[in-house]
Amino acid sequence: MTAAADGGLERARRVLALARRVVVLAGAGISTDSGIPDFRGPQGVWTKDPGAERLATLDAYMTDPEVRRRAWQVRLHSPAWEARPNAGHRALVELERDGRLTLLVTQNIDGLHQLAGNDPHRVVEIHGTMRDIVCMRCGARTAAPAVIERVRAGEKDPHCETTFEGANCGGILKSATISFGQQLSVIDLARAQLAVEDADVLLCVGTSLGVYPAAGLVPLALAAGAKVVIANAEATPFDDEAAAVVRGALSEQLPRLVEPIAEGPAAES
């Protein structure tokens, strides 16, 4: 770790040590050390294969059976099914146990925060989850493994098998993730915004802060008087406005970042 990076970590520790209400905004960078590639980084899914972005576009998915077939094969072979939380995820669990984490807003769809031990009621999956499947016609929701097994057994483009008055719905099935062209949950976004407006610190981890509306939480936090701490491998558009910037692998840096939390005001009360 360079001296500059070490200084950023120490500044971030001091900021967190004074905070009572911390909101975390997490991105794909926190899961890369669990074996899940990010999307826009140097080795990102869309960086290496720009055509893959079409699989995450709602209009293409709904109108093109071949896109759906490819998407189901990607889901079937996703490394996320075998991935396990890393030390970065566990550090955020410690932040919650410390009593300062008010909300964890994640752009990730892998569910690793909950697997690590974060309270699901304190996690907002603003881009949805890959662990559920939803019917685009009737809205029926089911756990993903059941549908994934249908694909493994040979179905190329599975459709909804929910029955209504003896008839199958037959609607298009899709992972319960937010695709390009699909609206975010108004409730989830409102929860995130309200929490940020009440926070002392917005801790951004593993996110390029280039995707809106999630990235819009940063100016919202700054306008509300909160400090922003950014921990990310690459530069972000908000680095100059942050109280501290931490570089390096999050599985190494986040445990160091939360270590001194017990020395803060919450431990004295």
Language-model regions: role of each:
Residues 1-269:
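Conserved catalytic core of sirtuin-type NAD+-dependent deacylases
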